[in-house]
C-alpha cells in the first residue's frame, strides 16, 4: 500500500502469487514496466469493467453523486473491437548511457527509458517503423549530438500517412543528414523538426520545419480528411473518436460547443451534422490547423475562438457539448 486514504487506497503489485481469472498473457514483455499500457495484463472485458467501475467511483467519491444519480448518468461503455494495434501515435524518449545514445519508451518510473523495437498498441500497418526509426537515429546519435528531446511517430492505416517528428531546441541541426538517413530507413510521408524553447517544464513551440515529404500528417475520421502539424493533438484511437461522435448523435437543428477542440477532431464532424458550432482552443498550432481543416472541408458554420476554454466559454446554451 503506497497511499491509504479515507475513501480509497493506492498500491503497487510486487509479486503475483496466484493470477486471477481476469489476467491474460499480454503480447508484450514490458507490461507492468512500460508506462504506456498498465492495463495490458487484463483481458479486454476486464479492462472495460474496471474502467467503468473507476468512473462510477470517481462520480461517487469526487462528484458526490448518489448511486441513483450515477446510474442515471452512466451508459454502457462503447468500445472498439481491437484491444491492440489501435494507436496512431507513439512517442520515443532519448537517453545516453555509457556514452551510447538510444531511443526507447518511458517506463512507469519516468526516469527509466525502456529499449523497444515494437509496440503492440501501435498501428500494425507501420509496425516496423519504431525499430527502423530507433535504429537510424541511434546510429546518428552515436556520431553527433542531435539534442533530441523526443521523437513522435504518427501512422494512419486509412490514408497510409506516416510522419516522423523530431523535437529539438532551436539552433543548428544537421537537416540534410537526418533527412537522408531517416528516408533510407523508413518510407515516411513526412519528416519534420519541431523546435521548442523556454524552461524545461514550460517549453513552447518556436517553429516547425519540414525535412522531407509533406510536412504534415493526414488522417480520415468519418468522412473528414484532416491535415495536422506535428505539435497538434489528435485522438490516438481514431475509431474510438468516431464511436464518440456517433454516441452524441448531433442533429441538423442543434448548436454544438467543442471545448479544447484541438485541430478539429470533433469540430468537423459536428459541423457537418449540426446547424452551428463554437470551437474553443488556446494552442496556436492547433488553431491554425483547425482553420485550415475547415477551409479544406468547406465548412463555414463554425466560430473558431482562440483562447482558454474557461475564459472564452460561449455564453450560450448548447444542445451538444
Question: Where are these predicted regions, by residue range?
Answer:
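SAM-dependent transferase fold signal centered on methyltransferase-like domains
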Residues: 1-209, 221, 225, 242-245, ...
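Rossmann-like S-adenosyl-L-methionine
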Residues: 173-321
Amino acid at each position: 500500500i503506497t497511499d491509504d486514504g479515507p475513501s480509497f487506497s493506492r498500491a503497487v503489485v510486487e509479486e503475483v502469487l496466484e493470477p486471477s481469472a481476469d489476467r491474460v498473457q499480454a503480447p508484450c514483455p514490458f507490461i507492468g514496466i512500460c508506462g504506456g499500457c498498465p492495463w495490458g495484463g487484463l483481458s479486454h472485458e476486464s479492462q472495460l469493467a474496471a474502467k467503468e467501475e473507476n468512473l462510477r467511483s470517481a462520480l461517487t467519491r469526487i462528484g458526490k453523486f448518489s448511486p441513483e444519480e450515477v446510474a442515471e448518468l452512466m451508459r454502457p461503455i462503447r468500445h472498439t473491437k481491437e484491444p491492440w494495434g489501435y494507436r496512431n501515435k507513439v512517442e520515443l524518449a532519448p537517453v545516453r548511457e555509457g556514452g551510447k545514445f538510444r531511443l526507447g519508451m518511458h517506463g512507469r518510473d519516468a526516469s527509466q527509458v525502456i529499449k523497444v523495437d515494437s509496440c503492440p498498441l501501435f498501428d500494425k500497418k507501420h509496425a516496423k517503423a519504431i525499430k527502423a526509426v530507433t535504429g537510424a537515429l541511434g546510429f546518428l546519435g552515436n556520431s553527433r549530438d542531435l539534442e533530441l528531446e523526443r521523437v513522435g511517430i504518427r501512422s494512419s492505416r486509412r490514408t497510409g500517412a506516416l510522419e516522423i517528428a523530431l523535437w529539438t531546441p532551436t539552433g543548428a541541426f544537421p537537416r540534410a543528414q537526418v533527412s537522408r538517413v531517416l528516408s533510407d530507413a523508413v518510407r515516411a510521408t513526412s519528416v519534420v523538426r519541431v523546435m521548442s524553447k523556454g524552461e524545461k517544464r514550460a517549453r513552447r513551440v518556436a517553429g516547425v520545419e519540414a525535412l522531407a515529404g509533406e510536412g504534415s500528417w493526414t488522417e480520415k475520421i468519418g468522412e473528414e480528411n484532416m491535415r495536422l502539424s506535428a505539435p497538434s493533438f489528435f485522438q490516438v484511437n481514431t475509431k474510438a473518436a468516431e464511436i464518440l461522435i456517433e454516441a452524441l448523435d448531433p442533429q441538423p437543428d442543434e448548436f454544438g460547443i467543442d471545448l479544447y477542440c484541438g485541430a478539429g477532431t470533433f469540430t468537423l464532424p459536428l459541423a457537418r451534422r449540426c446547424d452551428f458550432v463554437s470551437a474553443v482552443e488556446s494552442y496556436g498550432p492547433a488553431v491554425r490547423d483547425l482553420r485550415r481543416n475547415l477551409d479544406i472541408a468547406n465548412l463555414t458554420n463554425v466560430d473558431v475562438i482562440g483562447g482558454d476554454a474557461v475564459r472564452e466559454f460561449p455564453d450560450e446554451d448548447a444542445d451538444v457539448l
